[in-house]
């Protein structure tokens, strides 16, 4: 994992500990979008993680016809990034 991925993971953890407790819980997925992003960074690396996480975050809304989703959606670990 590169330094940029580690910085992003640190920022996400900061968000979860400092900012998120003051917001209404709104993630429709399990694991949450922030947990999913951290796992993608650890599994796939920076570029693919950003792509997968962005898609996931944009689908985290209730309107199915516009691509909204919910439920259990873990990171697919079958295709790991080459190291």
From Swiss-Prot:
The keyword Cell membrane applies. This is Putative membrane protein insertion efficiency factor. It comes from Pelagibacter ubique (strain HTCC1062). The keyword Ubl conjugation does not apply. Keywords: Cell inner membrane, Cell membrane, Membrane. GO terms for cellular component: plasma membrane. It is found in: Cell inner membrane. Its main location: membrane.
């Amino acid at each position: 994992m590169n330094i940029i991925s580690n910085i992003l993971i640190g920022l996400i953890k900061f968000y979860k500990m400092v900012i998120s407790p003051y917001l209404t819980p709104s993630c429709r997925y399990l694991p949450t979008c922030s947990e999913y992003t951290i796992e993608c960074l650890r599994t796939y690396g920076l570029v693919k993680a950003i792509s997968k996480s962005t898609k996931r975050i944009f689908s985290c809304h209730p309107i199915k016809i516009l691509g909204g989703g919910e439920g259990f959606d873990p990171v697919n670990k079958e295709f790991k990034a080459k190291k």
